[in-house]
A protein has these predicted regions:
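Nucleotide-state-sensitive switch-loop elements of NTP-binding domains
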Residues: 2-8, 13, 17-132
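Contiguous mid-protein beta-loop-alpha structural module that forms a pocket-lining wall or clamp
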Residues: 119, 136-147
Length: 147
């Protein structure tokens, strides 16, 4: 059964640094697929991680937890069927609610051979106040649902 781990956090919080560290230490020897969700035409870290031998499925047209829930489920199913990974890491855009990403995974996990394993939020403590003020509920939700 494929384990699914969600690594969330706002832009610049250190998600990619955390993921790279986990890939080289905690997940060494596992077949890992990274699903990253970035706004814009090109995912920010795709090229770097591909060079590390990590399969990446980039979804650039919206937030996993918002407009792509249907496409997200299809993408997740395709990844499991095509790669049969030990683990899938999901790095959602930092502009959504972690609770919605968790729900999106739980909604499809029974249809595929996968299980939600963990959900983590990376936070830059030097920016907590400004993020809390500017992003309110979205920022609070990511911290509240990290587990």
């Amino acid at each position: 059964m494929t384990k699914i781990d969600i690594i969330s956090g706002f832009l610049g919080a250190g998600k990619t640094t955390f993921i790279k560290k986990m890939l080289t230490e905690a997940f060494a020897g596992e077949q890992v697929v990274l699903i990253e969700n970035e706004f814009g035409e090109i995912g920010i870290y795709g090229g770097f991680l591909k060079e590390s031998g990590i399969e990446i499925r980039e979804m650039n047209s919206g937030c996993i937890c918002c407009s792509l829930v249907g496409d997200f489920g299809k993408s997740l199913k395709e990844v499991v069927e095509k790669y049969h990974p030990d683990r899938i890491l999901i790095e959602p855009s930092g502009v959504g609610k972690l609770s919605d990403v968790i729900k999106a995974v739980r909604d499809v996990q029974d249809e595929i051979d996968a299980k939600l394993n963990s959900f983590t939020t990376v936070v830059d403590v030097t920016k907590c106040r400004i993020y809390s003020k500017n992003f309110g509920e979205f920022f609070s939700n990511q911290i509240e649902y990290a587990g």
